[in-house]
């Protein structure tokens, strides 16, 4: 069984306040669309649109909820349990890479 096989695709637009930490209000204009894929094993991939130049790294509860971070062109992909609202995330950064959450970056079949 492929853990990263996509069961369903959901695309939603969250408010900037839902996605951006209060202390990062200067970056709210860069936050646009979040797409998330529901995966086997009740994991989700949150795909943050970072093409407008988000450059503030940080994840409030990374050690407790993250299972890995991957990069694909134009996006930062975060594997995590739960929902976007429970993550309380600051803007994602392309520079953070796989070191977040102490996990390796498994390859995604649709990343190439």
UniProtKB/Swiss-Prot annotation:
- Per its UniProt entry, which superkingdom is the organism in? Eukaryota
User: What keywords are assigned to this protein?
Assistant: Transposable element
Q: What is this protein called?
A: Uncharacterized protein from transposable element Tc1
